[in-house]
Amino acid sequence: MNCENVFETMVEHAMDYFESNYIHSAILGVSGGIDSTVVAYIFREVSKRLNSKGYGFKLIGISMPTETTDKDEFRISELVGNSICNDFKILDITNEAKSITVPKLEGQWDWVNKFRLGNVKSRLRMIHLYDMAKAFGGIVVGTDNYTEFLLGYSTIGGDGLFDYCPIQYLWKSEVYELANYFLEIEIANKRWDRVHAISESIGIPPQAGLGISKTDLEEIGAPDYYTVDTILKSVLDDTPVPEEFDNEVISSVIRRYENNKYKRNLPIVIGRDKFNF
């Protein structure tokens, strides 16, 4: 991937969109994971360039930990927020999430309750992001990549909801490529705070942080995102998966892709052509 070209395209597109629509801030949920770190870096450059031409713009990052948030990931979110964002805030939503969750229903399995609470946390974060967007005259920027979009790794009305996303059609393995490119830039710039933040983000295994399951790759059973992306590309292109890939991993990826197809086709509506008016 030509990281320089991809980065420049993303920055220029965002600059044009935000300026032409008179939007003066980007609101970003900063988790400490690779996706939000990469999006933060993209918008740091957008902010820098827009402000240099006299257009007031800022990237506002917010970390919203709960009791299930990985301590390392939260620590990294602080590194990213303080070194890359123009403004950074922390809001613990633990008690808020617990206060609005319906008590365990009789006969309901424990894993169902974990999913419910996890979804509440994700949707609460989105409520706060959109509230901040209103307060600061901005919009919410997303962190969804193509791999996780196809596999359904998002909560409907939660992290799957946003107004603008520069990495939606980047494979997860490409997000890592871009992060390493950013790392090289900051090493050359001797901005060691950003080097530290980006390198730490690259090193932490992706996970939702909702208290539902282990890391994403462990859940899939895949060794790395190159494997996952290659399988998904084969599915989309209707071509054979490389023979050296484990059959269980292939089945796991394809099963997640098929089972989450409904998320990629929402909302379901009835067209006017179906009615006899």
Region spans (language model):
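ATP/NTP-dependent adenylation/nucleotidyl-transfer catalytic domains that generate, transfer
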Residues: 1-28, 38, 42-45, 49-120, ...
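Conserved G/P- and acidic residue-centered "switch" motifs that form tight phosphate/ATP-binding loops
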Residues: 33
